[in-house]
Amino acid sequence: MPTAKQLADIGYKTFSTSMMLLTVYGGYLCSVRAYHYFQRRSSRRQAAEEQKTSGAL
């Protein structure tokens, strides 16, 4: 039977690990959003440039 200190240590390590994984996952989600944002921005810019050049003809 684990002592109270051992249970507290296990709980702390479990909590710390879950917080670390949530932080890593949050960073991943944030970077994916930023990547898609910049992809859409560049494709919109390209479409605007194409529209300008086709409108000038």
Curated annotation (Swiss-Prot):
Localisation: Mitochondrion outer membrane
Key words of the record: Membrane, Mitochondrion, Mitochondrion outer membrane, Transmembrane, Transmembrane helix
Mitochondrial intermembrane topological domain: 1-14
GO annotation terms (biological process): mitochondrial cytochrome c oxidase assembly
Any single GO CC term annotated in Swiss-Prot or TrEMBL for this entry: mitochondrion
Principal cellular location given in the protein's record: mitochondrion
Residue ranges that the UniProt entry lists as topological domain Cytoplasmic: 38-57
Topology within the bilayer: Single-pass membrane protein
Transmembrane segments: 15-37
A Pfam family assignment: COX14
Protein role: Core component of the MITRAC (mitochondrial translation regulation assembly intermediate of cytochrome c oxidase complex) complex, that regulates cytochrome c oxidase assembly. Requires for coordination of the early steps of cytochrome c oxidase assembly with the synthesis of MT-CO1.
Subunit structure: Along with COA3, core component of the MITRAC (mitochondrial translation regulation assembly intermediate of cytochrome c oxidase complex) complex.
Identification of the protein by name: Cytochrome c oxidase assembly protein COX14
Naturally occurring in which organism (per UniProt): Bos taurus (Bovine)
Gene giving rise to this polypeptide: COX14
